[in-house]
Amino acid sequence: MSLVVAIKKDGVVYLGADTRITKGERVASNLTEEELKIHRMGKCLIGTAGTVSNIQLMTSHPEWFEQNGKPLTKKFIVQNVVSKYYDLVKNMDKLEVEEQSSDSPKSGCSFLVTDGEKLFMILDDFEVIELSSYGQVGCTDEIAMTFLLNDGDRHEPNEMILKALRTSAYRNDGVGAPFVLINTRDNKFEIVEE
């Protein structure tokens, strides 16, 4: 399970994620940068939640995020990231389709993408949404969203992210500390032990 939370404030995007990894009955945390749920993809940061094999299909292609001086836009993400990701997931027969559902196929993953100026969410049905102030993907994302909506701007961004992550961890065993923080100004990971 995973939870990634992002807050956009004063021209900086702050991201935070849990480090808990669950596989069956096994619970662990991995603190190597390659295994964190926030990845550097060129000049972008991407937060990931969902099916690990499909996340790896996205994070193994940083070239999809090369903007060549162009701003990060919804159109750019749809044309250069989502279309290639969809084709790859489809060609590898990893689309999740419910038999008795008219819903479109899903990837089983959601992503938060930022270049520091803009913040986007890529949903598991490949829809792209531009976010104005904050977003969250993953397990207990509704709990995190409720916390962010109710707590508003009363705290600095990293404190809000940590409170949302802690509240979610309290409510669900799939989310847990230590937590990792990063922002687009400093671009350095910080591990927060509990």
Q: Which residues are covered by each model-predicted region?
A:
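Long, charge-patterned amphipathic alpha-helical coiled-coil/hairpin "stalk" segments used as oligomerization
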Residues: S104-G138
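Accessory, usually C-terminal, subdomains that scaffold auxiliary metal cofactors
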Residues: A164-T167
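Conserved short S/T/G-enriched processing/targeting/catalytic segments and their helical context
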Residues: M1-E99, V128-L162, V175-P178, I182-D186
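Patatin-like phospholipase
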Residues: F189-E194
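Conserved phosphate-donor
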Residues: E99-K118, R171-D186
